[in-house]
């Protein structure tokens, strides 16, 4: 719901908001420039002295104005010709032209009304309103994503566009809120929607009738410092009924032109002060530094517009059209999707198609539409639940748990929950788990035990599909490819073989970099940009789901390297480990930004076993200055010590600080978790120093490592979960 | 065609016999190319003693800017009721404004003066930009303003 309040104003007012922000940012420079350029009055200068100086220089002076920037301007009449100049308060002489610059005027016209008069003003006010709605809904979205306003500046994960969008927003939103609220106030004032704020005092009924007092003699003016002056208007020459008009930051008054007496005075009303403050906050006139900051924040708007559209497009692309979707009242299978970015819909579409082909009637809808009383012919309910942030319901599942709580369980319609998530997050499938517990507590029968799909894994999904097929008595083979990958051909350069003696035939395969088109190089698509830890996907010949391998090299290394262990009966691993130099495979690249060492100089603790050494070796090869401690588990050092010679070189070059190996084949089997226990003191010390832990390998090993670290860290009050939440403990598990 | 009668009836200042006799008068104002935003112009009449009688036209719709039309604002206290129904758009730099009104015959050759106050955003205010006596002889004779008005004349 909130997302809709963010998306539609954002898309509809995209151009308008961007234009407002850019012109506003450009205008924000002027008050500061004016303040720097204008000759400033000394602190003790009185209006009387200033007026005397100006009158001496320009005897026909009519008005002296002081801008909030401190710039003093005089207007005069000389032999029938009007003149004006910026005044140096020290001399009373003009030093520069008083007319505002063409550029500033043009920008102001654009910013305020697109040069379209009142219609343009209304359009720009609508733009400001859109900006306000975007800011408020954006705050709500960021708070939801980070788990509350308290976590406003928490670390972000995910694709660059989304991160950039939020990183900029959470700084710029303060300025954008201020600018849009003040803009709407000013627009309301322009269109007379605000109450009148009161004006000058009534002109005095009687004046002395005398003329000719020098401004320097007027007591009120001698007591008024120039820093408080707004405007001093001189009486009309030859009109004895006129008077001096003085406006200061306190109010407005009239001074007798014969006696200098203060004839009338009105303080600024609260409304006027409010208006002036809002004008200052919006324009930066009188608050140049604030203006510059607001301008800088406004510059974030075009970037947020671009990344916002990119996010919207990618979410749209991720949500496929579902053909032959049955109405909920007619379908045997109700498939409900709780998805945030839209990727889970793709899985639903795949299942919908497979079930429909098998002769089933299927309805696919968002989890937020859950209404079991309308499911007239349903035999089962399937729930695909992603998780948002720290366990919250994703966008399309908003309100689901409430609806579930209110609904009466239908014993004849069992339910199955499949969670979608990313194991490297602490709240893995937390929402799916919440749904499962809630359904269980309400007494819904479970069609299948709850299951999960990690990082859109096609394998996980296919496995669950087979279980579902078995339960339904249908052969169900789900082949889902989240994004149709664009493959490129890789040619094998060299291979090194290990592990045959310990029944773990493993090869380090090094491929040549594929040629990149100019467009790919510009956009960083395909293999034009990758780093160790990213994944390459290889499609098996039978069209099943692709197998993913972690990259052991980055683009700068000039080659594509992976470590593959041959699995008995594994189609892809068999094909890969049978490759000879010169032969080719087709592969696609999938970025894995969550598994990178990141910048900084904090120590790294790399933990891997078997082929899990691959990305870790890539990190070591690219390391320059960081202390790195590698825990490497193998079967036997004489057989599957992958990267043996390189590791020795890296140690000699200072890329690797310390190597701890664990050997599992021997008299006393030793695993990486044992090695961690043995080095508990140093591990604790490193983590206290801010070390980042990166784990790569099989799922059992990763679980063992987490357990070992939990025990090791317990005395220091830290837990792996805390490290994960802080982004200091990441896993790449298969 | 706007009628001054209704407007002047709002003010107590002008209760002359023979007011019913009126004729169309065209006020033609051409602005200098001063190169700024649209100018606000207040057209109003004072009597022989200089007292405000009534307004004829207001070019410029946003009342929050009226205080910059200094003399008019001082005379009326910024009362927008003075220009209700006789308000039009502001006049762009170098542009011409023609307004035709039914003016009472009694306003002519009786010591009344027509004033125009002008103001432009971010530029100097120009109260009393024009001050011409309303006389039958003066009709059709162009006068120049102090800053913004290149020429002004009224034709009967």
Question: Where on the chain are the PLM-derived regions?
Answer:
Chain B
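Bacterial N-terminal signal peptides that target proteins for export
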Residues: 1-8
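N-terminal signal peptide c-region/cleavage motif recognized by signal peptidases
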Residues: 15-17
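Short amphipathic, basic-aromatic surface patches that mediate peripheral association
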Residues: 24-35
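Extended, low-complexity, turn-rich repeat/linker tracts enriched in Gly/Pro/Ser/Thr and Asp/Glu
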Residues: 33-36, 122-124
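Structured domain cores in non-transmembrane regions
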Residues: 48-111
């Amino acid at each position: 719901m909130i997302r809709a309040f963010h998306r539609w104003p954002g898309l509809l007012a995209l151009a308008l908001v961007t234009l407002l922000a850019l012109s506003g940012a450009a205008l924000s420079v002027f008050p500061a420039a004016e303040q720097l350029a204008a000759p400033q009055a000394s602190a003790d200068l009185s209006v009387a002295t200033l007026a005397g100086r100006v009158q001496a220089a320009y005897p026909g002076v009519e008005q002296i104005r002081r801008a909030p920037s401190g710039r003093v301007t005089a207007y005069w009449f000389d032999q029938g010709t009007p003149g004006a100049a910026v005044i140096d308060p020290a001399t009373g002489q003009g030093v520069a032209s008083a007319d505002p610059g063409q550029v500033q005027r043009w920008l102001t016209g654009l910013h305020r009304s697109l040069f379209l008069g009142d219609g343009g003003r209304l359009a720009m006010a609508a733009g400001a309103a859109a900006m306000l709605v975007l800011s408020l809904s954006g705050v709500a979205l960021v708070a939801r994503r980070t788990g509350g306003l308290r976590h406003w500046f928490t670390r972000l994960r995910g694709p660059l566009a989304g991160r950039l969008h939020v990183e900029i927003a959470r700084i710029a939103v303060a300025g954008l809120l201020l600018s849009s609220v003040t803009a709407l106030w000013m627009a309301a004032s322009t269109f007379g929607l605000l109450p009148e704020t009161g004006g000058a005092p009534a002109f005095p009924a009687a004046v002395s009738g005398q003329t000719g007092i020098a401004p320097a003699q007027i007591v009120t003016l001698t007591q008024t410092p120039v820093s408080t002056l707004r405007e001093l208007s001189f009486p009309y020459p030859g009109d004895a009924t006129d008077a001096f008009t003085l406006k200061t930051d306190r109010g407005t008054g009239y001074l007798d032109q014969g006696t200098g007496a203060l004839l009338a005075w009105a303080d600024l009303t609260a409304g006027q002060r409010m208006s002036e403050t809002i004008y200052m906050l919006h324009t930066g006139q009188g608050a140049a530094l604030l203006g510059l900051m607001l301008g800088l924040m406004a510059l974030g708007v075009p970037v947020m517009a671009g990344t916002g559209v990119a996010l919207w497009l990618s979410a749209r692309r991720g949500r496929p059209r579902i053909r032959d979707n049955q109405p909920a009242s007619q379908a045997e299978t109700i498939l409900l999707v709780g998805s945030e970015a839209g990727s889970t819909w793709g899985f639903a579409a795949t299942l919908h198609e497979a079930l429909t082909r098998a002769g089933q009637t299927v309805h696919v809808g968002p989890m937020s539409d859950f209404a079991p009383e309308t499911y007239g012919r349903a035999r089962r309910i399937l729930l695909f639940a992603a998780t948002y942030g720290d366990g919250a319901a994703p966008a399309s599942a908003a309100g689901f748990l409430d609806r579930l709580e209110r609904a009466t369980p239908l014993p004849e319609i069992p339910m199955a929950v499949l969670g979608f998530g990313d194991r490297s997050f602490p709240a893995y499938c937390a929402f799916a788990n919440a749904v499962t517990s809630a359904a269980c507590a309400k007494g819904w029968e479970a069609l299948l035990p709850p299951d999960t799909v990690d990082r859109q894994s096609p394998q996980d999904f296919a496995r669950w599909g087979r279980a579902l097929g078995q339960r339904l008595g249908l052969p169900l083979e789900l082949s889902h490819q989240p994004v149709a990958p664009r493959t490129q051909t890789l040619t094998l350069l060299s291979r090194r073989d290990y592990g045959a003696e310990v029944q773990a035939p493993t090869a380090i395969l090094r491929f040549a970099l594929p040629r990149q088109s100019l467009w790919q190089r510009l956009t960083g698509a395909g293999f034009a940009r990758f780093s160790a830890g990213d994944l390459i996907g290889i499609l098996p010949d039978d069209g099943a789901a692709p197998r993913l391998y972690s990259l052991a090299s980055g683009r700068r290394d000039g080659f594509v390297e992976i470590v593959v262990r041959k699995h008995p009966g594994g189609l892809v691993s068999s094909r890969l480990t049978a490759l000879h130099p010169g032969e080719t495979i087709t592969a696609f690249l999938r970025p894995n930004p969550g598994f990178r060492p990141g910048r900084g100089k904090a120590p790294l603790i790399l933990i891997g076993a078997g082929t899990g050494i691959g990305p870790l070796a890539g990190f070591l090869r690219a390391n320059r200055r960081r202390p790195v401690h590698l825990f490497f588990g193998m079967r036997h050092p004489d057989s599957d010590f992958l990267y043996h010679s390189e590791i020795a070189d890296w140690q000699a070059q200072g890329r690797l600080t310390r190597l701890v190996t664990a050997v599992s084949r021997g008299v006393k089997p030793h695993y990486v978790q044992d090695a961690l226990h043995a080095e508990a003191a140093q591990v604790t010390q490193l983590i206290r120093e801010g070390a980042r832990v990166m784990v790569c390998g099989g799922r059992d090993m990763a679980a063992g490592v987490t357990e070992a670290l939990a025990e090791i860290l317990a005395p220091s009050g830290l837990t792996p979960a805390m490290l994960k939440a802080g982004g200091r403990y990441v896993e790449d598990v298969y | 065609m706007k009628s001054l009668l209704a407007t002047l009836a709002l003010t107590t200042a002008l209760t002359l016999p023979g007011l019913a006799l009126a004729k169309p008068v065209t006020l033609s104002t051409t602005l200098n190319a001063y190169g700024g935003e649209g100018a606000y112009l207040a057209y109003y009449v004072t009597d022989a003693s200089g007292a405000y009688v009534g307004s004829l036209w207001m070019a410029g719709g946003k009342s929050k800017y009226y205080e910059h039309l200094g003399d008019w604002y001082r005379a009326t206290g910024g009362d927008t009721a003075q220009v209700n129904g006789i308000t039009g758009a502001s006049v762009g730099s170098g542009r011409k404004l023609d307004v035709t009104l039914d003016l009472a015959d009694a306003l002519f050759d009786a010591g009344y003066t027509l004033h125009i106050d002008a103001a432009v955003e971010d530029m100097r205010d120009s109260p009393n930009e024009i001050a011409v006596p309303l006389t039958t002889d003066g009709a059709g004779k162009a006068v120049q303003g102090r800053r913004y008005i290149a020429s002004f004349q009224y034709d009967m």
